A protein has these predicted regions:
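Interface amphipathic segments
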Residues: 1-192, 196-301, 309-409, 415-520
Length: 520
């Protein structure tokens, strides 16, 4: 990094800053620079970010140039790709006026996502000192893709603002926004804000995203509709719904009651939410590497009432044909369709079952007290007898394959920072499975390697040892016992071909003890 700042009566303030070779795990910027030069009536500045072409990113050059004067400022941003094609060129001029600040978009033919747009020549956004906003702005291309932001004079309202987005293709922005997530879809949206003469704010929103995709997985067409309406009594009411493929999947309605000095000492809330066949498949796009695949949907209702800081929750959740598939183990977990009830903020599992291919389930019994989200109290018991944890043939994706049968008994009690876990697992004798140790640091090859080693005997006593911070696992007190029956065949392949491997045989007792004070 280079920083140079100079001041003098003759030349004023001059500054420059350069940062080279900024790198993180997923970010690589070759040059970041900023320069400022003072002139008699204004300060000129130019800045930018330069990234060269790399295997994980395309080259780009982003610049932000402009000037700042006593009563006026302007800035222009430009984006060039590796071929020096202009993806963005748009600016804004801000001017101080009596009673507020006026903003204008320049030029009248800006470039966005490599296309020319047209801005109305009389465009403005006026921010008044009294908080009111007046606007008349429209930016559209030949296909009527773009946005508009305008105010409507209304004698019955202090402010009446509308923001409209038309045919905005989200995926196109990946071409001009480095490191943007892999998301696609077409947005059509309209937001309306009204402030009445008595200062009440009203907001309505209609939003549609068609052909939504994330990480290459199609999520369908989505729509959001919401209304915010305050009342004279102080109540703030909201009503909304979310639809997927023209079917309602989430609805919400509720009110927030701010505290009053006499009758009410604390803020209150009264809200209801309902899930209508909410599809779990949408979670698959957010799971890295398709490590797990969800299917099925959720139905249920939830009501929150009482103090806003610690509301009481009541309702139930129904899992409808919910399955979780883990490709690396060819494991399919099927969840019980029995409703899970929530009463007075206590989530109760009444012998809730999880099945695999086998006949005997994994059972969860107990409850989770969610009255205080920061200190949720858990009291759970988990049991399984002759549970078929694994029954799969080897595939290209397999990390583990074969057959694995277990008896499992465990209890989990306490809060997240004071958790007590006790239990045992017995691997039954009819188990025969193989685990593939990928990217293993262990090797049995090259036995003659390092027969001769060259050592640098230079003095290293002055070198300070790097102290790594201790990794605390919180307030967990765990004692788990593992028993491997006679007859269990457990093989660990050191590579994918299985040319090097280890066998594990009968073991009377292996204990894993983790105390609260343990740090690594």
């Amino acid at each position: 990094m280079n920083v140079n700042i100079r001041t003098s009566p003759a030349e004023g303030l001059n500054a420059s800053m350069n940062l080279y070779g900024l790198k993180t795990d997923s970010l690589a910027l070759d040059t970041i620079y900023f320069n400022a030069t003072q002139q008699p009536d204004k300060i000129l500045f130019n800045s930018g970010v330069i990234a060269n072409d790399k295997p994980f990113q395309e080259a780009f050059d982003i610049t932000l140039n402009g000037d700042i004067g006593a009563d006026k400022a302007n800035a222009t941003i430009e984006y060039l790709n590796g071929k020096k094609e202009c993806g963005v060129n748009i600016g804004m001029v801000a001017g101080l006026q009596k009673g507020g600040i006026s903003l204008h978009i320049t030029p009248f033919d800006p470039i966005l996502v490599y296309r020319k747009f047209t801005v109305n020549p009389d465009n403005y956004i006026y921010l008044r000192d009294d908080g009111r906003i007046m606007a008349n702005l429209s930016i559209y291309d030949e296909l009527r893709t773009g946005l508009s932001f305008y105010s409507t004079p209304d004698s019955t309202a202090q402010q009446d603002l509308t923001l409209s987005l038309t045919q905005i293709n989200i995926g196109e922005f990946k071409r001009v926004i480095p490191y943007m997530p892999d998301i696609e879809g077409v947005i059509n949206s309209e937001a309306h804000y009204v402030q009445t003469e008595d200062g009440m704010d009203q907001i309505s929103l209609e939003n549609n995203i068609n052909q939504l995709r994330y990480n290459g997985i199609a999520l369908g067409d989505w729509a959001l509709s919401a209304v915010y309406l305050p009342k004279q009594t102080g109540e703030q009411h909201i009503n909304g719904l979310i639809m997927q493929n023209d079917k309602e999947v989430i609805s919400i309605e509720g009110s927030y009651f701010p505290a009053e000095e006499k009758e009410q000492k604390e803020d209150r809330i009264d809200a209801r939410m309902a899930l209508h066949h909410f599809p779990l498949e949408i979670a698959n796009s957010f799971i890295p590497g398709k490590m797990a695949m969800l299917s099925g949907d959720i139905d249920g209702t939830m009501q929150m009432s009482g103090n806003a800081s610690q509301p009481l929750m009541n309702g139930k959740i129904n899992l409808d044909s919910v399955n979780v598939y883990v490709p690396q183990a060819s494991l399919n977990l099927r969840f019980d369709n029995k409703p899970v009830e929530i009463k007075d903020s206590k989530l109760t599992f009444n012998r809730f079952k999880i099945f695999t291919k086998g006949k005997t389930p994994f059972t969860i019994d107990g409850d989770v007290d969610m009255a205080d989200f920061s200190q949720m109290k858990m009291n759970l018991k988990m049991d399984a007898n002759n549970f078929e944890l694994l029954n799969a043939k080897q595939t290209k994706q397999s990390l583990v394959y074969g057959k694995l049968y277990v008896d499992f008994h465990s209890t989990l009690k306490g809060t997240p920072d004071n958790m007590n876990i006790r239990g045992n697992m017995n691997i039954l004798g009819n188990s025969n499975f193989t685990y593939i140790l990928q990217d293993s640091p262990l090797t049995v090859e090259d036995r003659l390697e390092e027969t001769v080693t060259f050592t640098n005997f230079s003095d290293t006593t002055s070198a300070q040892r790097r102290v790594l911070p201790a990794l605390s696992l919180g307030g967990i007190d765990m004692l788990m016992t593992l028993h491997i029956d006679e007859g269990v065949q457990c093989r660990v392949n050191m590579d994918e071909k299985g040319s090097n491997y280890m066998y594990f045989e009968e073991c009377d007792c292996l204990s894993n003890i983790l105390r609260k004070e343990t740090s690594f």
